[in-house]
Amino acid sequence: MTLILTKNQVLHCQFSSWYSLFRKLTPKAKVIKPIPATVLKYLHEDSIYVEQPMNTVEEVDSEEDEESAPAYYPEREAIQLIEKAIKELGGAVVPKLNWSTPKDALWITTTGSLKCTTAEEVLLLLKSSDFVAHDLNHAFDDCKDFDNADGSVPKDFSFELVLKEWFPMHASTEFRCFVKSKRLIAFCQRDDNYYEFLKENIDCYEKLISDLLKKLDTFPDPDFVFDVYIHKDRAWLIDINPFYPRTDGLLFSWSELESMNSENMKPEIRLIPKGSMPSTGSAKYYTNRVPFDMIAASEGENLLEFAQKWQDLTNKSNE
């Protein structure tokens, strides 16, 4: 089987496309679409800027001041729109763009969590993520039917800001599930640590995942990958991705997934085996991280204080 990726497959996997179909199967969320133009411009900027309190902003009245003016930041109306959505979702959210959650930007947090309680935290996480940058610039890479030869996203494409209600998730019961011809061919745990209880409960998890898949029968593509979180005998739909190597196969290679027969009665199940080296998560997304001196600058600071300190250090180095 030779895998082919199309533009429609990618579009079907953007959050707003499937959330409208499966709203009752997934945690509560709000979609701001189109994303405010000033937010989109901020995400495309090269530098990271943290908003200053209104009473500290000085009027730029000279050429020298203009040269040292802070980098671009979204308008107040856009900030208020995000703050309103956060409040409506209970005061804490997990942000994402059309496809990607900024999991690779956890290095900029002091909590190791995607939990955001302010618009500034939302924007800083999105701005610091290579995954989000890929959404912005290369979402249609590898699509055989996409016109732009370099895979770049059209300028008139409608990006969306997704804010998902935050709640604590135990990584041990997150699974990635692979579907071919509408059949569950395989699934595996997402976390890379061994959990003894998973094996004894795996039959129950398989049934919950299979039951959830039946409710996804209106998804337009026969082949896709979906993520679930199992909690208290319920499988929650977390995300949907294309059945294509750009989606991480985790404990499966894509050559294995391509060769699996969708007619098999039982899906292939893989868990981290006992005796595997425990993971602290420190190596995950290692290449997305930053020099040690930037991390050292964050000691004792919250997210925004850390970013402001790093901005000050960067400005001094450029003097």
Curated annotation (Swiss-Prot):
The UniProt entry's GO CC annotations, sorted and at most eight, read: cytoplasm; cytosol
Q: Which keywords does the record carry?
A: ATP-binding, Chaperone, Cytoplasm, Magnesium, Metal-binding, Nucleotide-binding
Task: Write out the residues that bind Mg(2+).
Answer: D239, N241
Any idea which GO molecular function terms this record carries?
A: ATP binding; magnesium ion binding; protein folding chaperone
For whether the record's keyword set contains Magnesium, the answer is yes
Name the GO terms of the biological process aspect.
Answer: eukaryotic translation initiation factor 2 complex assembly
Query: Where in or outside the cell?
Result: Cytoplasm
The consequence of inactivating this gene is: Inviable.
Q: So where does ATP get bound?
A: K96, W99, T101, K103, K164, E165, W166, F167, E174, R176, R190, D227, D239, N241
**Which domain of life does the UniProt lineage start with?**
Eukaryota
Task: Classify the main location.
Answer: cytoplasm
General function of this protein: ATP-dependent protein-folding chaperone for the eIF2 complex. Binds to the gamma subunit of the eIF2 complex which allows the subunit to assemble with the alpha and beta subunits.
Q: Which family does it belong to?
A: Belongs to the CDC123 family.
**Entry protein name:** Translation initiation factor eIF2 assembly protein
UniProt lineage: Eukaryota, Fungi, Dikarya, Ascomycota, Taphrinomycotina
